[in-house]
């Protein structure tokens, strides 16, 4: 049953926010945050924000001072499909650069969004007030790499975000300090685990689509009919395996699990406005249904 009378969560209760990877399900994250910040939590009380993949984009906007209404506007106006597919697909790019698209325009857009709010070109982690944590994967060492004010103060934020969103095979991985970096979800798709020492003051947002259980396992067989389906399935398998290995009841108890009941893939390009609005509403509805467990914790 939905919580019909919103009750604010006190400043002392919540100070950490963890946003999982989820591709185009990012619209649902924004909907969830809209409901949370409008009715339950003052966003100024959030001190540390961690994000993976699309979660890293939203986490960054929150950390540098965008309001949830501003973030909603940006997410609905930005053309992710065009920004990611900024070049013609060729097998040469996939073979030589390990991805279908360079996505340079997407990185430039992320940099513009950051610069517009901070008024700083190539803004680094040390130049913002909140503690922003961006999760990436070092492909050469096959391990998680964290970028934050504490660990990498001089790192350019837009570059770290570009690494974190480098979905396998779709986007070219990023060469940094001699190593290749890819989607953070390949090794850590839900960064709530970074808050083990402060879990009772943390809220995480993650997903379960119509074919998933809350723990990330699939309910039914996923069809693979062409090369693109195969690539997407391979990427989702890596993200799912990292998620399943990390999730447990103690994390689910601190999580809003957004239910996506329509047949919309997290990697479905060319979402129309109706689909974006549906995902946004899924986020709002899931918070209304689940926030009570966090209030009563």
From Swiss-Prot:
Residues forming the catalytic site: 53, 183
Main localization category: membrane
Membrane topology: Multi-pass membrane protein
Residue ranges crossing the lipid bilayer per the database entry: 17-37, 48-68
Motif (GXGXXG): 21-26
EC number assigned by the record: 3.1.1.-
Compartment list: Membrane
Keyword RNA-binding: no
Keyword set, alphabetical order: Glycoprotein, Hydrolase, Lipid degradation, Lipid metabolism, Membrane, Transmembrane, Transmembrane helix
A Pfam family the protein falls into: Patatin
Motif DGA/G per UniProt: ranges: 183-185
GO BP term (any one): lipid catabolic process
The keyword Hydrolase appears for this protein: yes
Purpose of the protein: Probable lipid hydrolase.
Protein name: Uncharacterized protein R571
């Amino acid at each position: 049953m939905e919580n019909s009378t919103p009750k604010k969560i006190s400043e002392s209760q919540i100070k950490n926010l963890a946003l999982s990877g989820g591709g185009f399900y990012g619209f649902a994250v924004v909907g969830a945050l809209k409901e949370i910040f409008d009715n339950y939590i003052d966003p100024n009380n959030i001190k540390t924000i961690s994000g993976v993949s699309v979660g890293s984009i939203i986490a960054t906007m929150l950390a540098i001072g965008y309001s949830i209404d501003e973030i909603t506007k940006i997410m609905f106006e930005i053309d992710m499909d065009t920004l990611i597919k900024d070049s013609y697909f060729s097998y040469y790019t996939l073979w030589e650069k390990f991805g279908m698209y360079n996505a340079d325009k997407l990185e430039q857009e992320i940099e513009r969004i950051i610069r517009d709010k901070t008024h700083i070109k190539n803004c680094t982690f040390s130049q913002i007030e909140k503690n922003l944590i961006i999760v990436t994967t070092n492909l050469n060492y096959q391990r998680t790499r964290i970028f934050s004010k504490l660990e990498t103060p001089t790192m350019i934020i837009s570059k770290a975000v570009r690494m974190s969103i480098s979905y396998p095979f779709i986007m070219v991985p990023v060469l940094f300090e001699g190593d290749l970096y890819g989607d953070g979800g390949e090794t850590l798709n839900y960064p709530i685990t970074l808050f083990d020492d402060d879990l009772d003051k943390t809220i995480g947002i993650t997903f379960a689509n119509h074919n998933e259980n809350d723990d990330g396992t699939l309910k039914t067989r996923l069809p693979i009919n062409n090369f693109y389906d195969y690539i997407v399935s391979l990427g989702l398998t890596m993200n799912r395996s990292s998620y399943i290995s990390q999730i447990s009841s103690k994390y689910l108890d601190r999580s809003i699990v957004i239910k996506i009941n329509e047949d919309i893939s997290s990697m479905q390009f060319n979402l129309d406005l109706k689909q974006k609005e549906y995902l946004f509403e899924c986020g709002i509805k899931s918070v209304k249904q689940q926030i009570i467990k966090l209030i009563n914790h």
